[in-house]
UniProtKB/Swiss-Prot annotation:
Keyword Nucleus (UniProt): no
Residues the record lists as binding substrate: Q88, R184
Organism the protein comes from: Bovine herpesvirus 5 (strain N569) (BoHV-5)
Name by which UniProt lists this protein: Thymidine kinase
Quaternary organization: Homodimer.
Single GO MF descriptor: thymidine kinase activity
GO BP term, example: TMP biosynthetic process
Family statement: Belongs to the herpesviridae thymidine kinase family.
Lineage: Viruses, Duplodnaviria, Heunggongvirae, Peploviricota, Herviviricetes
Active site, UniProt feature: E44 (proton acceptor)
Residues at which ATP binds: G15, A16, H17, G18, L19, G20, K21, T22, R178
Function in brief: Catalyzes the transfer of the gamma-phospho group of ATP to thymidine to generate dTMP in the salvage pathway of pyrimidine synthesis. The dTMP serves as a substrate for DNA polymerase during viral DNA replication. Allows the virus to be reactivated and to grow in non-proliferative cells lacking a high concentration of phosphorylated nucleic acid precursors.
Membrane-spanning segments: none
Keyword Transferase: yes
Length: 350
């Protein structure tokens, strides 16, 4: 007799670096015996970035970013921007591979006969971190250009129903304190990067809420102001108040408003080219599939307990009963291969 179908909860812990996501994910995995079924943790793919290939992607992107910072303002130098975008794509690759592998194990969403067993998959970041949020922060800093950002965003994967994104956040002063405390060679813990990254995640949460409420980027696009150099500089300014998730976001509160730039209108034309509109349509489709939960991070054990408390409200996806063992093996192999020196030796994350 075939094993009863499983109900799979997919949880993506995300947000700016230095918030304790990795530690929280391990705390969740340690809670595998908690009510609600086993928890499988997929850590950050640090080895893929740093040791699996001759070039270290983290060192590479830091060097490319420094090269861009040494240049003058305005559009990023094409060569420097291309190098930053190349390394950013390297960061995305293992997330996209893992995402595709897990998606292949999920069954269609029709109700399953019987089978109340639940398995929770916890991922240290969603592919959107590398395809959209970090690139968006780099775009605000003028490390990459609009064409680079769109190219990276276009690689964001289709999302099967049942994806739950937990955006971890902290008050700006506390986040800055933690980043300063954990700074080490190879970290991107400078004070200039976290403000636009924090804003990227706030805008992401607003965008998902806007789309989830039935909003459409095409409605009101023409009335939006231009996201010019001053607007991007404001998103990158650590002295600003920053953007925050809002209860009922409008189009102006979303990533789409920050993407309305003159670079998308070649030759100064008045109409958005269809290919760019299609790219924004595709991005909207992917973001609309996410259920977003906000988490004001505390100690990792408290965060893990909070995430477990959210689990009953999270979306689920059916999988064949036989997929349970496959998912467990996948989690073990991914953790073993992606953690330099073993799970206990890994850096805390980007």
């Amino acid at each position: 007799m075939a094993a009863p179908a499983l109900r799979v909860v997919r949880v993506y812990l995300d947000g700016a670096h230095g918030l304790g996501k990795t530690t929280t994910g391990r705390a969740l995995a340690a809670a595998a015996s908690a009510a609600g079924g086993p928890v499988l943790f997929f850590p950050e793919p640090m080895a893929y970035w740093r040791t699996m290939f001759p070039t270290d992607a983290l060192s590479g992107i830091l060097a490319a970013s420094a090269r861009r910072a040494a240049a003058q303002g305005g559009r990023a130098d094409a060569d420097a921007a291309g190098l930053v975008a190349y390394y950013q794509a390297r960061f995305a690759a293992p997330y996209l591979v893992l995402h595709a592998r897990v998606a292949a194990l999920l069954a269609p969403p029709e109700p399953a006969p019987g089978g109340d067993d639940v398995v929770t998959l916890v991922f240290d970041r969603h592919p959107l971190a590398a395809c959209l949020c970090y690139p968006f922060a780099r775009y605000c800093l003028r490390e990459i250009n609009a064409e680079d950002l769109l190219a990276l965003a276009a690689t964001a994967p289709l999302e099967a129903p049942g994806a739950n994104l937990v955006v971890c956040t902290l008050p700006p002063a506390e986040q800055q304190r933690r980043l300063a405390a954990r700074a080490r060679p190879g970290d991107r813990a400078d004070a200039g990067f976290w403000p636009p990254l924090r804003n990227a995640y706030a805008l992401l949460a607003n965008t998902c809420a806007f789309l989830g409420a039935g909003g459409a980027w095409r409605d009101g696009w023409d009335a939006l102001g231009w996201a010019d150099a001053d607007a991007l500089a404001a998103l990158a300014d650590p002295r600003g108040g920053g953007r925050e998730p809002v209860p009922a976001p409008a189009l102006r509160d979303t990533l789409f408003a920050a993407l309305k730039c003159r670079e998308l209108y070649p030759g100064g034309g008045a109409d958005l080219p269809a290919v760019h509109a299609w790219a924004l349509d595709a991005l909207a489709d992917r973001l609309a599939a996410l259920e977003v939960f906000m988490d004001v991070s505390a100690a990792p054990d408290a965060c893990a307990a909070a995430v477990l408390g959210m689990r009953p409200a999270m979306r689920r996806r059916r999988a064949d009963g036989a997929a349970g063992a496959t998912l467990a093996d996948l989690a073990r192999r991914f953790a073993r291969e992606m953690t330099p020196g073993g799970p206990e030796a890994a850096p805390r994350g980007l």
